[in-house]
Amino acid sequence: MQKPSGLKPPGRGGKHSSPMGRTSTGSASSSAAVAASSKEGSPLHKQSSGPSSSPAAAAAPEKPGPKAAEVGDDFLGDFVVGERVWVNGVKPGVVQYLGETQFAPGQWAGVVLDDPVGKNDGAVGGVRYFECPALQGIFTRPSKLTRQPTAEGSGSDAHSVESLTAQNLSLHSGTATPPLTSRVIPLRESVLNSSVKTGNESGSNLSDSGSVKRGEKDLRLGDRVLVGGTKTGVVRYVGETDFAKGEWCGVELDEPLGKNDGAVAGTRYFQCPPKFGLFAPIHKVIRIGFPSTSPAKAKKTKRMAMGVSALTHSPSSSSISSVSSVASSVGGRPSRSGLLTETSSRYARKISGTTALQEALKEKQQHIEQLLAERDLERAEVAKATSHICEVEKEIALLKAQHEQYVAEAEEKLQRARLLVESVRKEKVDLSNQLEEERRKVEDLQFRVEEESITKGDLETQTQLEHARIGELEQSLLLEKAQAERLLRELADNRLTTVAEKSRVLQLEEELTLRRGEIEELQQCLLHSGPPPPDHPDAAEILRLRERLLSASKEHQRESGVLRDKYEKALKAYQAEVDKLRAANEKYAQEVAGLKDKVQQATSENMGLMDNWKSKLDSLASDHQKSLEDLKATLNSGPGAQQKEIGELKAVMEGIKMEHQLELGNLQAKHDLETAMHVKEKEALREKLQEAQEELAGLQRHWRAQLEVQASQHRLELQEAQDQRRDAELRVHELEKLDVEYRGQAQAIEFLKEQISLAEKKMLDYERLQRAEAQGKQEVESLREKLLVAENRLQAVEALCSSQHTHMIESNDISEETIRTKETVEGLQDKLNKRDKEVTALTSQTEMLRAQVSALESKCKSGEKKVDALLKEKRRLEAELETVSRKTHDASGQLVLISQELLRKERSLNELRVLLLEANRHSPGPERDLSREVHKAEWRIKEQKLKDDIRGLREKLTGLDKEKSLSDQRRYSLIDRSSAPELLRLQHQLMSTEDALRDALDQAQQVEKLMEAMRSCPDKAQTIGNSGSANGIHQQDKAQKQEDKH
């Protein structure tokens, strides 16, 4: 019987659902069962055989399966694709992928879960590993997969514990029942065997958090470890570091909960993604699995090979050694006291005491093992619970965040729905207001249409009255035409009669001349003789003739005045009627145009209003439809408590929709009626407009002949246009001359550029001189060095001379050498002085050249700026020339047209003059005088109009001349300011340079001459232009005077 210690016996079965991925092997009796059950998928497959199988299991050799021991995170185990598994012992699913991935290093398993509680659909980071529905795929380490759920695993542990206790009881009873003749096992041997077995079997369940020394021995690269009790990872580095003293362990975590990427303070210890690396002291790192590269079988054989040496470090070895010492002391006492002749009963009691001690030791050992196992289990369960709590807390936090987000989204959607409802209501109110406004506008339009119809009736009455008046005027015109034809016929008859009466007129003229001669003679006689006496026979006849002459002259004057007044009145009446008809025509045209504009405006306004209404209603309908769809989409996903509001909103929206449809129908009907009315009115107005247009066309044909007569007044304008053409041609020639001069100036600028390039060559020569100077300095330095060497030799020779006075011959030789050296030194000094002088001269020349070059560079820069300014001015002038040439071309075309019209008008004038002369010849005296006066009045009006036109053209010409003179003055002023002073400066500055720049001075003088010539040209051009214009004006004045004389 087991002692009531209150402790639960430890479980020896395999735990596949351990959060740390560790597989716990039991005693010898359960190891084979676990190995077999791992293949069959049940941990209790071979533990139900009862206590009878325990001795055989204990006697069987320890051969655990390799797949049951290799349970590291990076080891795939014996899982296959399509196998049924549980993730963390909770989530059932099917394995669909096994291998490496791109999102994290190591081996991973892709599982398709039964429920949508996963994280993906088989794709991570844009890479697809398998296919499954959304939120049913998950990737995990193979160590977190089990073939059974967690509840069954805990049951297997309890069952293994019960079997273990049964085995211990059977062993205990077996050891107590044998007879005295049975073989007694020595204490040391039995304890060692049991300790070896228990140590080997319970080694995987023992905690790996021993001393630092043991951690250093066991931790290897690639081991799965637990850092701080919560973070799992793989060992990537073990050893000393630069950032702190002691032994440190570098771990690559499974999740981004670290602090680095394997590098600290610029030193890299291993490689991993950012936030996946973590360094910790070795005593804080707990190994939770074996390395993926070293199988568990090799580990177990290694432990068995260690033998008894492993027991020295185990906590049970000390108790075993103390028990053995107690047993040895108990067994040794009889031998010391000399009790060798004890009886067999005492011997049997001694044996029973030793067996009791052995059993007590075994029970203590078992209790110790159970406590250790329970401690390991508790630690594993605590670690599992902490990890599970962390995961649950994370899930709870995620669920809380999702719930809060969902609540916030639902509130936002509800708020949006409310806002949409409010906006729809506001839009409904706005639409009702707009409909009211549109109705008012339609009523206003109807009122306007009625007003237009009233005004249209008034206009029709006015047009009828005007038609009647026009008919009366046409009748009066016909009467006047008939009268004019009658007068023409009378004139023709008079012309025929005058031909017959010419001879009589000649005779009468001859008689008149004779009579005049006689009258003169008589007058002379009367003057000489005085008044005739009353009794003279010719006195009565003379008086009678005088009276007749006076009466004839008075009658002739009276008749001419009457005819003149009559013709003037008729002309004034005709002119007034013509003016009235013109005003009426213009008035009718304006009224017709206004009516057309009003009709078009009304139709366009109606169409615009209808288009606006249609677009507004369409947009409102589409907006309402969209808002309804959005509300349906948002409210369908919300909770069930919002269904009532959704129903209300749907009802409200349907009501609004029906109201809008009704309003649309009403508006469409009104629009159709209004459009039909407008179309009818438009057709009626078109008919009236066509009638008015026909009437206007008749009036226009009637007055077109009279307007063509007025066009003959513009014939004299052609002469002035021809004069303008001549002036323009002269100006074009002047501009061409200026263009030639500008081209010469451009050539001068190019020459200056060439001179600048020569100056640049000079600069290159100056650089060469600088190089030669540097070489001369180097030679001077070398000569100085030689001089120093010679002086040293001279000093050495002098020292030799002072020390050796005895050797005179040698001293003479040395003196000769010193003389020679002195001469060479003097020659070198002379050369050095010469070179110094040359160097100073060269330096002065170089400085002068530098100053000249800098001056030339500044001059070149200024010259380039001026050249650019001149080029810009040239381009501007060319553009002005082009515009002027275009204007002159257009003016020449206009002049040609005007000249043709002048020729036509001159021909018509000549024909009219011929007709007038013939009419004057054939007409009698009073009619001739009247026609002359009429024609003079007409010609005076025409001359006045022509004079006005001539004045306008002269003013235009003067304006053009002023613009041209201003542009010429501006151009010449720019030329004078920019080119001439700069050329002078360049001349004065280039004269101070070397002989290579003299050609530039000559060219500059040529350019200056060109500029002076250009200065003198504008005055000549202006004088020529002014003289030409003055001659033209003088000729025009002469022509006008001649015309006035005629």
UniProtKB/Swiss-Prot annotation:
Keyword Repeat: yes
Comp. bias intervals (Low complexity): 27-38, 48-69, 314-338
Disulfide bond residue pairs: none
Domain CAP-Gly: 99-141, 239-281
Location(s), subcellular: Cytoplasm; Cytoplasm, Cytoskeleton
Alphabetized GO MF terms: microtubule binding; microtubule plus-end binding
GO biological process, one term: cytoplasmic microtubule organization
Biased segments, Polar residues type: 143-153, 195-210, 1023-1034
Source organism, top-level taxon: Eukaryota
Keywords: Coiled coil, Cytoplasm, Cytoskeleton, Microtubule, Phosphoprotein, Repeat, Williams-Beuren syndrome
Pfam families recorded: CAP_GLY
InterPro entries noted in UniProt: CAP-Gly_dom_sf, CAP-Gly_domain
Quaternary structure (record): Interacts with CLASP1 and CLASP2. Binds preferentially to tyrosinated microtubules, and only marginally to detyrosinated microtubules.
Disease: CLIP2 is located in the Williams-Beuren syndrome (WBS) critical region. WBS results from a hemizygous deletion of several genes on chromosome 7q11.23, thought to arise as a consequence of unequal crossing over between highly homologous low-copy repeat sequences flanking the deleted region. Haploinsufficiency of CLIP2 may be the cause of certain cardiovascular and musculo-skeletal abnormalities observed in the disease. However, it has been demonstrated that haploinsufficiency of this gene alone is not sufficient to cause any of the cognitive or facial features of WBS.
Function: Seems to link microtubules to dendritic lamellar body (DLB), a membranous organelle predominantly present in bulbous dendritic appendages of neurons linked by dendrodendritic gap junctions. May operate in the control of brain-specific organelle translocations.
Entry protein name: CAP-Gly domain-containing linker protein 2
